[in-house]
Amino acid sequence: MASLYDMMLRHSLYLEGAKKGTADEFSSSVVSDLDAVVKRAFQNINVDNFGEFTKADFNRFVADIRLRTNDVHNKNTKELMNDTKKLSRVETTLFQGMFREDTGDRLATPSNVWGSVKNSNIPATGQTFQKSANTFRNSSVGNIERLLRNGYADKLDTTDVFKSIRGVKSLGYKDGVFGKISGWGRTLASTLMSHTSSSVKDKIAPSYYDEYQWVSVLDDVTTEICWERDGEIYKMGEGPQPPAHYNCRSMTVPISPSREDIEEPDTLAEWLDGQPSEVLKDIFGDVDPSLDNVKVISLDGLRDKLDIILI
């Protein structure tokens, strides 16, 4: 049987794969829906230059786009919330399985895990799920509206305003505000999933363990707060929880009897060197094992990983 430390690190890599898949799907859906809304709105105006708008017509144009882009965000946020709710159920199953395997105890699952998770403040934002999603929505809609108002104030050509929002094909549409929104969307989804996983663990682990250790991925992009917390041991229910910031990759590992006299590796690379080949192949496929190379998996795929996590 794997040590709890090995189980938790394997799980964290599978979780990264699930986060990648969900975050990419969410951001792609948001941008695709926004693109359709903005494109349709621009096709319905009869001006070649924003200076040709009357003030009343321009305000109606902006109000229509604001309404429709808000609808896009509300629809996609609802789908993301459904994904995080599903993740909470998956993580409840996985953590119960790991903790029961490690301790031999079969304790009851805490009630209302999802309700506790969704209403808690995310350490990275200081806000609940819904408020964090609202911040993303307001930034997205506000940036689109800002470009529209700049176009009107500066009497810009309609095509130039459209390109400033959508970007240009030769640059992969990454130069427009949609490129920024895509990145913000991935960050939001990834952070909400990290918080979901961490909160589920924090809800279940105190029934089995008294303390936990903070474990950070240490590399050239590790933040100061995660460097400082790496290796620190806290009492259950009293210490900090990831995500400490947006895109946080840190995790916590309960202090378990199975970790006695185990010398833990200093780096992820050293730990990977000691893992069974079948585990590495399942996590990374045929590429070199590293955090950037974890395979994308679905939430259903994550749910099915308990057996290999326990090897």
Predicted regions mapped to residue ranges:
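Acidic, glycine-rich two-metal-ion catalytic cores of nucleic acid-processing enzymes
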Residues: 162-267
